[in-house]
Amino acid sequence: MWMKIQRVKTVIYSVSLLVAASSLMPIANAAEKLQITLRVGAYFRAGHVPDGMVLAQGWVTYHGSHSGFRVWSDEQKAGNTPTVLLLSGQQDPRHHIQVRLEGEGWQPDTVNGRGAILRTAADNASFSVVVDGNQEVPADTWTLDFKACALAQEDT
């Protein structure tokens, strides 16, 4: 059983000098509510982008009883790996950037086939959204749209 689902959505931009929306977006802040925060990283240029380049850093917080967290996106998966996404440009849907969700202890969610799971009773967990593979990225705008939930104790 999944509980306390929240969603965070932000936009990354690529222009000649890729402008990334540097924002901190808390979704909720009450003690028993799930919080998901996504902060987009520094500016980068359209063109060659190296594998592993961090595009955004995310945090999930839940102070209630739980056994872990799940973070996922409804964006198109790239291949068979649940943590890899293929984002389409907003200005031109033929423009793509392939990204992956990663972080210490996070594992691909092979049961649901989307996103990643972290088994932990800790109140906080962090994750990163990084470029998946060396790519030539055109100037465009992409949306990062992630959802998160805390896993109920019986989900372990």
Predicted regions and their residues:
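Bacterial N-terminal signal peptides that target proteins for export
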Residues: 2-15
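Mid-chain, structured segments of secreted extracytoplasmic proteins
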Residues: 74-120
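Generic hydrophobic alpha-helical membrane-segment signal
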Residues: 14, 116-118, 128-129
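A conserved short alpha-helix in the GNAT/GCN5 acetyltransferase fold that borders
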Residues: 16, 20, 147
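N-terminal small/polar-rich segments of proteins
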Residues: 28-91, 124-137, 141-143, 147-156
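A generic short-segment signal for beta-strand/edge and adjacent turn/coil regions
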Residues: 26-29, 37-41, 68, 95-100, ...
